[in-house]
Amino acid sequence: MSQKLILVLNCGSSSLKGAVLDNGSGEVLLSCLAEKLNLPDAYITFKVNGEKHKVDLSAHPDHTGAVEALMEELKAHGLDSRIGAIGHRVVSGGELYSESILVDDEVIAGIEKCIPLAPLHNPAHLLGLRAAQSIFKGLPNVVVFDTSFHQTMPEVAYKYAVPQELYEKYGLRRYGAHGTSYRFVADETARFLGKDKKDLRMVIAHLGNGASITAVANGESRDTSMGLTPLEGLVMGTRSGDIDPSVFGFLAENANMTIAQITEMLNKKSGLLGISGLSNDCRTIEEEAAKGHKGAKLALDMFIYRLAKYIGSMAVAAGGLDALVFTGGIGENSDIIRERVIGYLGFLGLNIDQEANLKARFGNAGVITTADSKAVAVVIPTNEELMIAHDTARLSGL
């Protein structure tokens, strides 16, 4: 009998991303992306054997309709009977979950309890989870939380300096994100360098449209840049990152903006997009900065400066630095950003190897610092889907 496959789902409020993986080899046999869910022109795109095709979802434009279309596609390729379990990415498990878990009614209630911590994401994850339970009847479901990896942070790192009853009553603290990526990359970095991860003090930068950075020591998260929500920390595609909280009062008073408007502005209209006035896409920002566009140049400069500053602070949290790791779409592909960031870090004993830095792109891992550097900087491609598949297989007994 052929080995059971794992279906991995990642649901957003208007999207559903899916992949069918062979847990042993990590091969992706089928992938899909549903977009514009809950709108009349919803659709889903499937990719199988390098071929793409689109299916209209206008008759059932919700998450359930997307999962139904996925089931039909699996049947068409004879894959439906080979699915052994389903793994779901969930943004926030709050303090309830420090590791991945097999889904039951109690877990669903727990994810619901964490909705205030991820109001944009957790409701969508629940829609996808319920759709999977109803359409893939009898299959085990596993949830993998973005926040779990950071539950090892010490109190000095996760607490905010506010009245403590706010933490006790409302769970107001730093939770972090991208934990599944950090767990995968920490393991891969140790394997790539031929070391035990418990012997490595790592600072890992997960850089994409959402960007964060984490200090890892003894294989565990010691501190991270994202906070109560993913808004804290680095300059991102559309998020401001760190900002003086009194900005809310200032804008309410002087610009007549509501809390909801300010929150949306800081999450969706700030970052690279807000500074440049052009785009949230780092590739566009790099191209336009090279052509002399002032806004793009400033956006790139601010992104790099904030990142370098955070690397220094995360080296403190890790107790030193053995390996600086770049991952995520920007971290894996932008040799320009990596070189400029490392240019700030000579005081940590890091020197860029320009040739190696150019080679470490498009899925290629590699050390990008010179042999005489006191620590290494390395590029390690992330694979959150594979990490979710591994957890799902383990917890469902496959």
From Swiss-Prot:
Mg(2+) binds at N10, E384. Keywords: ATP-binding, Cytoplasm, Kinase, Magnesium, Metal-binding, Nucleotide-binding, Transferase. Homodimer. It catalyses: acetate + ATP = acetyl phosphate + ADP. The active site is at D146 (proton donor/acceptor). This is Acetate kinase 1. SUPFAM superfamilies: Actin-like ATPase domain (SSF53067). It comes from Neisseria meningitidis serogroup B (strain ATCC BAA-335 / MC58). It comes from the Bacteria. The record marks H178, R239 as: Transition state stabilizer. ATP binds at K17, H206, L207, G208, N209, G210, D281, C282, R283, G329, I330, G331, E332, N333. Its cofactor is Mg(2+); Mn(2+). The lineage of its organism: Bacteria, Pseudomonadati, Pseudomonadota, Betaproteobacteria, Neisseriales. Belongs to the acetokinase family. NCBIfam families: ackA.
